[in-house]
From Swiss-Prot:
GO terms for molecular function: ATP binding; ATP hydrolysis activity; proton-transporting ATP synthase activity, rotational mechanism. Pfam families: ATP-synt_ab, ATP-synt_ab_N, ATP-synt_VA_C. It is a peripheral membrane protein. Produces ATP from ADP in the presence of a proton gradient across the membrane. The catalytic sites are hosted primarily by the beta subunits. It comes from Paraburkholderia xenovorans (strain LB400). Its main location: membrane. It comes from the Bacteria. PROSITE patterns: ATPASE_ALPHA_BETA. GO terms for cellular component: plasma membrane; proton-transporting ATP synthase complex. This is ATP synthase subunit beta 2.
Amino acid sequence: MSTTALVEGKIVQCIGAVIDVEFPRDHMPKIYDALILEGSELTLEVQQQLGDGVVRTICLGASDGLRRGTTVKNTGKPISVPVGKPTLGRIMDVLGRPIDEAGPINSDVVRGIHQKAPAFDELSPSTELLETGIKVIDLICPFAKGGKVGLFGGAGVGKTVNMMELINNIAKEHGGYSVFAGVGERTREGNDFYHEMKDSNVLDKVALVYGQMNEPPGNRLRVALTGLTMAEHFRDEGLDVLFFVDNIYRFTLAGTEVSALLGRMPSAVGYQPTLAEEMGKLQERITSTKTGSITSVQAVYVPADDLTDPSPATTFGHLDATVVLSRDIASLGIYPAVDPLDSTSRQIDPNVIGEEHYSITRGVQQTLQRYKELRDIIAILGMDELAPEDKLAVARARKIQRFLSQPFHVAEVFTGSPGKYVPLKETIRGFKMIVEGECDHLPEQAFYMVGTIDEAFEKAKKIQ
């Protein structure tokens, strides 16, 4: 459609990020149509049709200085963003415009951010495991290639650091393309991530889309869809793509803000009434088809450490693996602070991961569960009152707990110890030795912040 043929309307009301625009009655824009402001780069997205030619839109950008009577043009199509190889190595905003000052993105292909999820008969479930090199994840909640993973945790327990380490280990080993969507997170983290990718020479395989904390709610709500659209394009070209989202909770929160601005009645805890539908629309599109796969890792902030909050609770149902980060474990100084009793994966099945891996995982969890049950008795009566087999279980559990810690590559600057990548075979061998009692003679400090079990033996020699 040429610019001359665009239907014009006028702004009739501005309330924060919500703008009402009046069009001729017979040329009323459709829901999700993108409207552009004359003489400015501001884009509005139609959310509601109020009747009499008036539509209610959400502003994708700062609405400062807007006034009634300003001319608005209807593009006649939804927001479209550039996709494909020209987006790699670039930082873009919600509209796919470059924000890295490295010139325009010369992509011939653009794609609307609102797409239908693949049909059921196109889906392709996978049982192939994706090795992360992080012991606790590979053992307790292994990831499936083409699966969906959630990193759940409250404020400051290490979601972003865990995600950075996963990107570091998977994106570098994986060799394929990755898309990172920064949804409502800190600008500093986005900057750190960009330089991390640049320094490790994988920037040319990553497309970065940011709608950070300082952006209006419209941007934060749509930026996840922008990133997903880019990932879908690579998948539909037959590639295996990694899709990272930090943070899904901010997507929900932006939806809450927009919903309130649009005048919808809030539901439980003040969330939007359409929470499940909005989450479903996003999550159903993050999926693997017979053409290609999307493996997604999503950080999910847990408000007030309450996993029953509607936002994280709605996300749980869509995931194949959940990695739950615990404040109690973080307070012990054990990082990554993954809770081995709360975290789970659909891949924990002897037919998928093999009998040995399955039995070791369950053995580790049983030992830790026994320790958890005995902690109250120990706190009141002390270790001496325990039966000999319980003392042994506690000693092994404390070694397992420490062996689940691991130095990260991305945290080297803070910890001073070099990061470790532990292959799955080594992880299983190490935990098997602890569970079967082959390490009972070693002190528990030897297991803290090491990679393989051999390093624990070396450390024990130094301690003794």
